[in-house]
Amino acid sequence: MQEEHVEYYKDGSVKGKGLIVDGKMEGYWEWFRKNGTKMRSGHFTAGEQVGEWITYDQQGQVYKVTNMRKRG
């Protein structure tokens, strides 16, 4: 089963969003600060962080890039 998942802050603004497949995070996900700027983004495979993950500064500019390797 596949579904779009959105998490919200108490004030109703979007906290994070991405795809859930068979109960696990899958594909591209992104998280936001309460002011709407992007905080982090990256990909999941079967619930595991993989590939390039980007952390953004308070202005939404790229702050750090981390390459995640699949375990196993």
Residue ranges and their predicted role:
Residues M1-G72:
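Glycine/tyrosine- and acidic-biased, solvent-exposed loop/turn segments at the edges of beta-strands
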